[in-house]
Curated annotation (Swiss-Prot):
InterPro entries: YmcE_antitoxin (IPR031853). It comes from Escherichia coli O157:H7. NCBIfam families: PRK09891.1 (NF007379). Pfam families: YmcE_antitoxin. The chain crosses the membrane at residues 12-32. It is a single-pass membrane protein. This is Uncharacterized protein YmcE.
Length: 76
C-alpha cells in the first residue's frame, strides 16, 4: 500500500492533487444544498478530468465515491 501511494505521488503534481481532493470532498459534504453542490461539481469535474489522465487516480477517486456518501448518510 505504501509503495503504491509513493509511486503515484511521484507522478502527481501535489498542488493539483490536493486541490482536486478538496473540491471533491466539498461537493460531497454539501449534498443537502443543491445550489452549492452544482457549483462545486463544476470545479470538481475540471479537476477530475485532469486527474484521470494519471494512472492510479481512478481507483483513488472511486474509493472516495463509494466510502464518503455512507459516512454522510450515517449522520442523519
Amino acid at each position: 500500500m505504501h509503495r503504491w501511494i509513493s509511486q503515484n505521488n511521484i507522478r502527481l503534481p501535489c498542488g493539483a492533487f490536493f486541490i482536486s481532493v478538496l473540491f471533491f470532498f466539498n461537493a460531497v459534504c454539501i449534498v443537502s444544498d443543491n445550489l452549492l453542490i452544482i457549483e462545486s461539481f463544476g470545479e470538481m469535474a475540471y479537476n477530475i478530468s485532469y486527474l484521470t489522465r494519471v494512472p492510479g487516480t481512478n481507483t483513488l477517486l472511486a474509493c472516495c465515491c463509494l466510502l464518503r456518501p455512507e459516512e454522510v448518510n450515517s449522520e442523519y
